[in-house]
Amino acid sequence: LAILGVVGISLPLINIARKEQGSSSFYGAIAFGALIASIGYVIYQFANGSIAPAAIFSQDVLADDAFGGLFAIAMLIVAIMTTVGSFNYMKKQKNSAVYFSLILLSAIGMVFVAYSTDLVMLFVAWELMSIPTYILAGYMKKDPSSNEAALKYFLFGALSSAIIIYGISIAYGLTGSTNIGEVIQ
């Protein structure tokens, strides 16, 4: 995930630092490499058997287990397919660095969703995945249908987030915990 985060933040900065506009295939290749490296790391974890619970802020909100790893690989493959499928499309567009950066940042959220063991972390990860996709939906700023789609997607996402928060609050009220394992028992 650190690879995706560093590259995702670096792509627009590299674009700004370069004097001439970089080609979309350059930024796409960097994003592709970061995604391949992330899949390689997850597979390396499986091969070493170093799958152990991860803790953030001394709370078990992420579990680095085989189930999460399998879905993390699936999500990263989806991000790779999106990146590869965007090469030709982005040749005609400006700011391809931002486009590929948003794909990587969304992939981070997808991987966090896969490893999440807490409802609050699941919600935060879902939002981390969703917010870049709202921007991607409205990427074609001058196209009215793109703007309309982004607005509708954002409003639908905001309503969905409110419903999810309401459901999490009910689950917490009934069980006294937001841990998924404790909530389902």
Q: Which positions does each model-derived feature cover?
A:
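Alpha-helical transmembrane segments of multi-pass membrane proteins predominantly involved
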Residues: 1-185
